[in-house]
Amino acid sequence: MDHRAQAREVFVRAQLEAVQKAITKNEVPLKPKHARTIIVGTHKEKSSGIFWHTVGRIQLEKHPVLTWKFCHLVHKLLRDGHRKVPEETYRYVNRFTQLSQFWKHLNTSGYGPCIESYCKLLHDRVTFHNKYPVVPGKLDLNDSQLKTLEGDLDNMFEMTIDMLDQMDALLVLQDRVYEMMNSLRWNSLIPQGQCMLSPLIIAILDTSKFYDYLVKMIFKLHSQVPPDALEGHRSRFRTIFERTKKFYEESSNLQYFKYLVSIPTLPSHAPNFLQQSDLESYRTPHAYLHSEGSEDGTSLNGHDGELLNLAEAEPQQASPSSQPDPREEQIVMLSRAVEDEKFAKERLIQEARSRIEQYENRLLQMQGEFDHAKREADENREEAQRLKNELALRDASRTQTDDARVKEAELKATAAEERFNKMKGVYEKFRSEHVLALTKLGDIQKQLEASEKSKFDKDEEITALNRKVEEAQREAGRALTKAEGDAGAVDEMRTQLVKADIEVEELKRTIDHLRESHANQLVQSSAEETNKIRLAELEVAKESGVGITQMFDHCEDALQNATSITYPPHLAQSAMNNLVNILSNERLDEPLATKDNVFAGHLLSTTLSAAASAAYTASIESYEGVNDQCKKVLAAAKVAFSDDSALSRADKMKLLRQDIQTLNSLMISLPLQTDIDKDVVGNELEQEMRRMDDAIRRAVQEIEAIQRRARESSDGIRLEVNESILANCQALMSVIMQLVIASRELQTEIVAAGKAGGSPAEFYKRNHQWTEGLLSAAKAVGVAARVLVESADGVVTGKGKFEHLIVAAQEIAASTAQLFVSSRVKADKDSSKLDALSVAAKAVNQNTAQVVAAVKNGQTTLNDEGSLDFSYLSLHAAKKEEMESQVKMLELEQSLNQERAKLAALRKQHYHMAQLVANKEGEEAQE
């Protein structure tokens, strides 16, 4: 008794735990194992009392998911539970009405209408089973039961109406569920969507059964009742047919139902009940769970596969590309193979678990039969022993009768023993099968673990391939961008030249055409035609003058950047000689010499840019004079090629030639590389290094003075920005001074190690090229320091641009980098002075970055302060400001693209000229 009470307690506790775990607030489908435990419990208990007792303690109105899972679980119990479940559920039918009314107007996350429909469905379903107790919960009726129902015409007529109502309730439920899925944009691969869709699996099974019975019963009614009396049946059935067909088609497209339930296909047209021949061609729609294998499978494990998680079954989609990458195709194939293997393993495990549970149930049943047989055998033994004792006490006269009774008892005992042995053999057989099934399950789990590991390895391989693909795409993008930039710059220059040539040719053709077409009329009206041609030529000359002026404006911009590139002086001298020869042509004095004017203007703008760059390359001291003269020549050229001045064309061209002769003289006087005296280069280096030190000290002092003036003239955010920028500039100059000191110490060490008993002057003379490199670097540092101070002063006073200061800081960092590289060339790699110089160079780079960051932050702060306060604007004014801001943004983007193209062209020209110089020096060295 104690053992039975303990087993009973364990059973009840398991039922309570299963109900509590099945009905939870988590938006995931109902767990099959918990539902299966409850269903098996109803069969073992032959009642659903424990379930309803447990559910009565749960406050289903607390959360919509609780009510939804409760309805799903009740639906499962009605189908797969004990045959008494529908009868017992009818006692709680009012509970469904209460829940339906409660959730009717509470559209919580979309569950409200769905729960209302589900509760109404269960209410009608329980009432249906109570009205027709012959119909089981799973709706499986054999032919004899169906014929019994069809025997009573009135009952069959009313039953078809009730079945139509059941179909309506099921279809209303699926409509509500799909409407909620569409409104929330859920799909069948997420847990929330699966939670909503899981009850529709039972709806598919129920609708297929009701549909089959309706077709057969309505055909039977038409054979016994006039068709006019069944018009309502036919009308309702046609509507239900269309809705059911749509339901099956939509459900078959969902990935969630694909591996769980077999969805039947209905014909294109509803059966014609007025023709009994359609009944012969009618085919019963079979809907069954895949875990059952057919519609006649065991009900206890009918929903094992219902929670198959397909959330990860969606294959990874590679980003669309016009040309598919083989590696991406390999990734997709590997992903699909992994998912297929995983699905096969999971399905195999589900089937194994289902069979194990069948074996366990059968084992429990056999155990009960075995215990019953054992008790009968014990009772038979006791009866035999009792009879033997009675036979010993009876009279001898009844010996034969007693012997017969003893033999009969012995035969019964022997039969009981044989039956017991058979039951024991069957029990051992099922036990061995159970052990074998457990062994197979363990092997399957090991295979699953191996497949999971293989999937993980393949995922890592896929990730690596993705990274390689992305890196290759980035490399291709960078290469394409670079190629497009270079090609764009070249194409733009070529396009401009071609456009200019085309315009000149078109203008020439226009002039020639005018001359030819009016040649015959020239005799009659020569004065008039001459004036027209003169006006046309003047217009052409005016247009060409505008083009030349634009080239001069471009040249003026190029003069501002003359210090950013290097240019060989001898090439500039050659271009200057060509320009002098061309401007000596007296045809330029004529206003209508359009072709010569255009060519001369183009050559003049190019030569002026080259002259300024060559002067900076040859000698920084000579740069100022040459640059000023270039600007003077440019101004004279603008006057000479325009019609605004009162002077004649010949006088303006004469003044231009004089300015160009002056510039040519300055270019001739530029020092060449061969003019540097190797004997005095050492002294020049020392002097330049001292001048560089003085320039840096003066720059530091001027920055301090600028800082003092800024404190006096500004306040607030402007003062904070100026303080930050000037402090970083001062720190930059300090580390540059340290780098210069380290460079001089390293140079002293190099000279001491390499003079070999000679004087430093002799060392500088022997290594004059290295000395010249140091000299050039020192000059660049001095000039860059002065430019930095001027840019900082302009930023503080508001007269300059923040970008100028950024460029100046980067320029001085580049100059110090040149000094660092020049000093490092002949240094010993193990020298401590070289290490100190490297540390100083890194400090310069860091402080340069800090200056750039401070300038950008200050610019952002000031822009935010000045431009982001729009509280004073009206609606119309704000819209106008918005449009103007967009226009300005587009203009700036266009200007940025043009400057990038210009920079690319300048760099290309610079590299080309540098290559020419290198080739010429190589030829001279060979000679």
Swiss-Prot record:
Keywords: Actin-binding, Coiled coil, Cytoplasm, Cytoskeleton, Endocytosis. It is found in: Cytoplasm, Cytoskeleton. InterPro entries: ANTH_dom, ENTH, ENTH_VHS, I/LWEQ_dom_sf, ILWEQ_dom, Sla2_fam. Residues 673-914 form the I/LWEQ domain. The keyword Zinc-finger does not apply. GO terms for cellular component: clathrin-coated vesicle; cortical actin cytoskeleton; presynapse. It holds the Pfam family I_LWEQ. One of its GO terms (molecular function) is actin filament binding. Gene3D superfamilies: 1.20.5.1700, 1.25.40.90, I/LWEQ domain (1.20.1410.10). One of its GO terms (biological process) is ultradian rhythm. The keyword Cytoplasm applies. Residues 336-524 form a coiled coil. Regulates pre-synaptic vesicle recycling at neuromuscular junctions of mechanosensory neurons. Plays a role in maintaining a normal defecation cycle. Belongs to the SLA2 family. This is Huntington interacting protein related 1.
